[in-house]
């Protein structure tokens, strides 16, 4: 069971890190090429679509499985392996902290701007959203990648 939990931690964290990397290197650069009038509604639709279903499962699993792997005692796990799993869990938890305290409030402000009366110009909405969101997303991507590497290292011990 402990080996399975660590394997699930590696897989879920790897899936999450890959998703973050695709957003960082493909989706956001693609959206950056859009006009303000195209970018703002496109990002709103992404924010409505992404945090559901499979993504939500992976988002939760990338913290739950490392925590479970750490909680279950393992015969023969070295102190180094335990510390690597703990470090991976800390990176995943910090990733969630950035998401919950940074990206989600920006997403919520973007959604609220659609209903504002009078609505703010898309150029102002984009300026308030894009650079801060991208900066926070870079942090999330780096934390997710670090968590993945740390958990892979723990699994290889």
Where are these regions (language model features)?
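Juxtamembrane boundary at the C-terminal end of a transmembrane helix
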Residues: 151-157
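Interfacial loop at the N-terminal end of multi-pass membrane proteins
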Residues: 15-60, 109-130
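Interfacial segments of alpha-helical transmembrane regions
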Residues: 1-14, 74-94
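Membrane-helix exit/interface motif
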Residues: 27, 43-44, 54, 64-76, ...
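Hydrophobic alpha-helical membrane-embedded segments
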Residues: 12-22, 92-103
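Extended, charge-rich alpha-helical interface modules
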Residues: 92, 148-149
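Internal alpha-helical transmembrane segments of multi-pass membrane proteins, especially GPCRs
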Residues: 48, 86, 131-134, 138-141
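Core segments of transmembrane alpha-helices
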Residues: 58-70, 141-148
């Amino acid at each position: 069971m402990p080996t399975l939990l660590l394997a699930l931690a590696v897989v879920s964290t790897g899936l999450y890190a890959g998703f973050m990397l695709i957003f960082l290197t493909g989706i956001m650069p693609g959206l950056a090429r859009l006009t303000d009038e195209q970018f703002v509604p496109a990002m709103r639709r992404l924010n409505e679509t992404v945090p559901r279903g499979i993504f939500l499962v992976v988002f939760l699993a990338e913290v739950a499985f490392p925590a479970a792997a750490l909680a279950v005692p393992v015969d023969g796990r070295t102190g180094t392996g335990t510390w690597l799993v703990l470090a991976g869990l800390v990176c995943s938890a910090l990733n969630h902290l950035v998401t919950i305290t940074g990206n989600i409030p920006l997403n919520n402000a973007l959604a609220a701007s659609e209903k504002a009366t009078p609505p703010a110009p898309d150029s102002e909405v984009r300026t308030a959203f894009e650079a801060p969101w991208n900066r926070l997303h870079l942090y999330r991507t780096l934390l997710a990648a670090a968590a993945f590497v740390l958990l892979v290292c723990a699994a290889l011990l």
